[in-house]
A protein has these predicted regions:
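Intrinsically disordered, low-complexity coil/linker segments enriched for acidic/polar
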Residues: 9-13, 58, 103-105, 142-145, ...
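Amphipathic alpha-helical segments in structured regions that serve as interaction surfaces
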Residues: 40-47, 108-113, 142-151, 161-171
Length: 175
């Protein structure tokens, strides 16, 4: 399976259209992608491959899980995504540059901490939905691996990883 299989899936596209409608006030992509397609597909596939490794499942299995989860839980996927886009994560302390940049240095990104922290114009596209789906699969199927993924892959501190998981669980409980 490929990224194209995911983004052309009717259930995924239905969710994406609803998220677009609900967030018209944000910098949301009018199409599916705003970036160089080939490069972005590679990035998204890498995200899925890495997440699947933390879940101890094949990439194809994770993709199938994402598609089935979306098919069976469309309203949850839409509502969870809308909440994530509209609620600030209540961390107990500011994130470090490493946490904000998922492990990249300021030199590698050539973006100052303040600019990275204040990034409110990030373009929201279908890739955002796919990352939220990965989060949901972790929460519902592989919660024990989620904290490890957040600390190792996304470079969150132990405290921030725990707070992030609680934040997402609270969203689900309140839907």
């Amino acid at each position: 399976m490929s990224i194209e299989d995911i983004i052309k899936n009717e259930d995924i596209l239905d969710c994406w259209k609803e998220i677009q409608k609900s967030n018209s006030d944000k910098n949301i992509s009018k199409g599916i992608f705003e970036y160089d397609i080939e490069e972005y597909h590679t990035f998204l596939l890498d995200e899925i491959v890495e997440a699947s490794e933390y879940m101890n499942m094949s990439t194809d299995t994770l993709i199938n899980e994402m598609l089935l989860f979306t098919k069976d839980n469309k309203s949850l996927v839409i509502n969870f995504s809308n909440e994530r886009l509209n609620k600030k994560i209540p961390f107990s302390s500011p994130l470090s540059y490493e946490e904000l940049s998922n492990g990249y240095t300021e030199e590698e990104l050539d973006i100052a901490y303040q600019d990275l922290e204040n990034e409110t114009d990030a373009i929201i596209d279908i890739g955002t939905l796919l990352t939220y789906l990965i989060d949901l699969i972790f929460l519902f199927k592989e919660e024990k691996s989620y904290k490890k993924y957040l600390t190792e892959k996304l470079c969150y501190s132990e405290i921030h990883a725990k707070e992030f998981i609680e934040y997402e669980k609270n969203i689900i409980e309140n839907l």
